[in-house]
């Protein structure tokens, strides 16, 4: 008799995705982040669900309800901080996952890559709306500044902003709709993640060499299941270290002050994972130009397959491209630092140079390096 996991309609799907899936024998720990993102998503949905049971999306009580969760709800503080720091872990895993894709040429799986970019946008939108919910100073002013960017759109801008606000400023209507969207989006993300996986399993995984691994496959279980469990344990270890020892390390102290439309904080800045994009936005003096640069800084990922001019898929055997890749990483770290600094003398020019460098590296320098490496192969 055939094993039930290979015949049962539901178990068959799980079996083909996580048990008998043929996987390359040489994928490194950089391939762990997909499963870690899945764990992060489930964790965020569960902690978010329990937070939603006690949260009220009304401007008068939102801040108090978060305080109530932390002080009066059994283990509410740990749920709240797991959710807040879980978002940070989510983005760390996302950036590593995207970086892996760029380094090893995984973007050549077009459908998988494009769904991934959509997933990135959806996750960023969810995180932004979630940051507004506690209704602290940075929540309110962050929402005001970022939604206001839409007013840069010619002709329909102002109407669009007021439509999103549900009034003439960020208020009760805005908070309520943001809560509704923040609740529904993770489930859409989950559905998209399944499509992401579906497309990936059409082609099979890439591997560090970028060469077809059809000649040497191993079953996903037990090899990669045990590897994923190790990754998950490390993820939970880091998350719980953050939650239990320094829960507010990555937060903003201003968010412990209730939202006040009459008092603007001296430095409005988003959560750390948006700072690189925020720095690019601020480095362009023109409002519309800044908004376009902000969107393009992430949308540029869609162009990666077009910008791939190398005869080799992976960067494993391409030293010049490797060097440029790590310069790009350093550049993004620089932008992240600049995004959190005030808009004054040394920081403005550093931000502008780092922004130019970012687009220059991706659009010009890396494709040029690829062609140079192609020619070096002929020698």
UniProtKB/Swiss-Prot annotation:
Binding of heme b b562: at which residues? Answer: 83, 182
Q: Which cofactor(s) does the record list?
A: heme b
Write out the GO cellular component annotations. Answer: mitochondrial inner membrane; respiratory chain complex III
Q: For binding a ubiquinone, which residues are annotated in this chain's numbering?
A: 201
Instruction: Look up the coiled coil feature and give its residue ranges.
Output: none
The disulfides recorded in the entry are none
Q: What Pfam family is a match for this entry?
A: Cytochrom_B_C
UniProt keywords (A-Z) are: Electron transport, Heme, Iron, Membrane, Metal-binding, Mitochondrion, Mitochondrion inner membrane, Respiratory chain, Transmembrane, Transmembrane helix, Transport, Ubiquinone
Q: Does the keyword Heme apply?
A: yes
Name its cellular compartments: Mitochondrion inner membrane
Cite a single GO BP annotation: mitochondrial electron transport, ubiquinol to cytochrome c
**Which positions does UniProt annotate for heme b b566 binding?**
97, 196
Q: Which GO terms describe its molecular function?
A: metal ion binding; ubiquinol-cytochrome-c reductase activity
Q: Topology in the membrane?
A: Multi-pass membrane protein
What detail does the entry give on cofactor binding? Binds 2 heme b groups non-covalently.
Q: Which SUPFAM superfamilies did the record assign?
A: a domain/subunit of cytochrome bc1 complex (Ubiquinol-cytochrome c reductase), Transmembrane di-heme cytochromes
- List all membrane-crossing ranges: 33-53, 77-98, 113-133, 178-198, 226-246, 288-308, 320-340, 347-367
Additional comment = Heme 1 (or BL or b562) is low-potential and absorbs at about 562 nm, and heme 2 (or BH or b566) is high-potential and absorbs at about 566 nm.
Which family does the record claim for this protein? Belongs to the cytochrome b family.
Q: Which protein, by its recorded name, is this? A: Cytochrome b
Question: Which species does this protein come from?
Answer: Redunca redunca (Bohor reedbuck)
Whichever gene encodes this chain, its name is MT-CYB
């Amino acid at each position: 008799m055939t094993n039930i996991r290979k015949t049962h309609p539901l178990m068959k799907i799980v079996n083909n995705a996580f048990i008998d899936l043929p996987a390359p024998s040489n994928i490194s720990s950089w391939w762990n982040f997909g499963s870690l993102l899945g764990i992060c998503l489930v964790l965020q949905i569960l902690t978010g669900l329990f937070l939603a049971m006690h949260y009220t999306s009304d401007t008068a009580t939102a801040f108090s309800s978060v305080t109530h969760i932390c002080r009066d709800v059994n283990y509410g503080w740990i749920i709240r901080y797991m959710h807040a720091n879980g978002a940070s872990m989510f983005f760390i895993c996302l950036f590593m996952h995207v970086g892996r894709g760029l380094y090893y040429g995984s973007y050549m799986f077009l459908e998988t890559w494009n769904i991934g970019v959509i997933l990135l946008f959806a996750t960023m939108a969810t995180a932004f709306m979630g940051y507004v919910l506690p209704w602290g100073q940075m929540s309110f002013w962050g929402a005001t500044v970022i939604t206001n960017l839409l007013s840069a759109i010619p002709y329909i801008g102002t109407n669009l902003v007021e439509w999103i606000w549900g009034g003439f400023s960020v208020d009760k209507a805005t908070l309520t709709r943001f809560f509704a969207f923040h609740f529904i989006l993770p489930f859409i993300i989950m559905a998209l993640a399944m499509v992401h996986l579906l497309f990936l399993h059409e082609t099979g995984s890439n591997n560090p060499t970028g060469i077809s691994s059809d000649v040497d496959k191993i079953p996903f279980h037990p090899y990669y299941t045990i590897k994923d469990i190790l990754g998950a344990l490390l993820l939970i270890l880091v998350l719980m270290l953050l939650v239990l020892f320094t829960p507010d390390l990555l937060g903003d102290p201003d968010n412990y002050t209730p939202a006040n439309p009459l008092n603007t904080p001296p430095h409005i800045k988003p959560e750390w994972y948006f700072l690189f994009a925020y720095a690019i936005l601020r480095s362009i003096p023109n409002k519309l130009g800044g908004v376009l640069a902000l969107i393009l800084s992430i949308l540029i990922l869609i162009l990666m397959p077009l910008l791939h001019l190398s005869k080799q898929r992976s960067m494993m055997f391409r030293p010049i491209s490797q060097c440029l890749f790590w310069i790009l990483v350093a550049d993004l770290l620089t932008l992240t630092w600049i995004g959190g600094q005030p808009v004054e003398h040394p920081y403005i020019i550093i931000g502008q140079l780092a922004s130019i460098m970012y687009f220059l590296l991706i659009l010009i320098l890396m494709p040029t390096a690829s062609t140079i490496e192609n020619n070096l192969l002929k020698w």
